[in-house]
Amino acid sequence: MNNLKVIEEKNGVLDEITGEEGIIRTEREIINAYISDEYGNKVNTASCYVAIELAISPSVGSPFIFHATTQLNNWCNPYRLYICGMDVNPDIDVEGDGKLCPQLDKWIMNSYKAVDGIKYAYGEYRPSSDDKKHPLVIWLHGLGEGGTDPSIDLLANKVTVLADVPFQKCMNQAYVLVPQCPTMWMDDGKGEYKSDTKDSIYTKSLFELIDCYVKENRDIDTNRIYIGGCSNGGYMTMEMLLHYPHYFAAAFPICEAYHDEYITDDQIDMIKHIPIWFTYAKTDHVIDYTLCTEPTVKRLLAAGASNVHVSVFDDVRDTTGLYKNEDGLPYIYNGHCSWIYWDNNECYDGNLNAWEWLGQQGN
């Protein structure tokens, strides 16, 4: 198969400033090719399937496009891989039938309509049935993952890791609920960012969804309900704590966007008992941590909070050794993407690990 060549053709962003979109063609690097079964598993017998492994990087191979107009991620449409050297012309069906996502195998896609008419799509992971109570972990997505397709919410920021063995071991087998709002959590009702003391249009209905999910799954331990998320989802995490301070056993807001000036002293007193683990990077130019996380942490500690932790990173960089800049140094991500450290279980406060800490919390 030495004569193989793969050309990727997809719609993408042509101009980062204007947001202009168009078709982009790229030759992909082939790192392996072999005879396989229909799921891509290597076989040593005759088969009508061939698996081709392609190199990826933070800037190469994503099947998603971030639309500047809607501020939402979506599946690239079209997304085609032209394979030269073989008599095939595969086309990934963006509606779902033609793509395999093993990361989603453990997840169930569902939906919920609240009494106010707001409809949520959501992904859920359910632990094996037994006679034990299980914690519930709730993940709230960022700006780009709103919409009606929860697979985007699960895949765009590696949320599927919450169903994998390392995280589940720390949680002692947890339910995971990943709600997707139709727009953005910070929606003020007019499609604009909420920037004052008014509630998000999703505050009440999101809690309704969570509470209904807990009541429908009677083996969820109501003393171990954990909530967190990134950016817009970090904002909504804080919103949930401020409105329902005795419901959640712990929280893990990441690069959260809730401006501290809108949190009253009385509200600080109401949430100071909640175990909270904050995460952010100093190079975040999307959310100003000096207006959000940093002053809120100071006020919580001053009010006597005894279980507040913070992971602060100088920047967001690749720690796997797989991705490098042109100078050979580790690839530097947008400083807003501090959720990468959370997803990779790299958040610490001294010797204390965030995942292990979360699994130990309870009302």
Regions found by a protein language model. Name each.
Residues 128, 132, 190-231:
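Gly/Ser-rich "nucleophile elbow"/oxyanion-hole loop immediately N-terminal to the catalytic nucleophile
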Residues 140-142, 255, 280-281:
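The conserved beta1-alpha1 loop
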Residues 136, 143-204:
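Active-site machinery of serine-nucleophile hydrolases
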Residues 277-279, 283-297, 301-363:
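C-terminal catalytic histidine-bearing segment of alpha/beta-hydrolase fold enzymes
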Residues 172-174, 270-276:
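Short, proline-enriched alpha-helix->beta-strand connector loops that line the catalytic pocket
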Residues 214-217, 222-270:
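Primarily recognizes the serine-hydrolase "nucleophile elbow" in alpha/beta-hydrolase
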Residues 1-134, 296:
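A domain-start/cap signature at the N-terminus of enzymes
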Residues 63-65, 147-153, 187-192, 239-240, ...:
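Short, solvent-exposed loop/turn and secondary-structure capping segments
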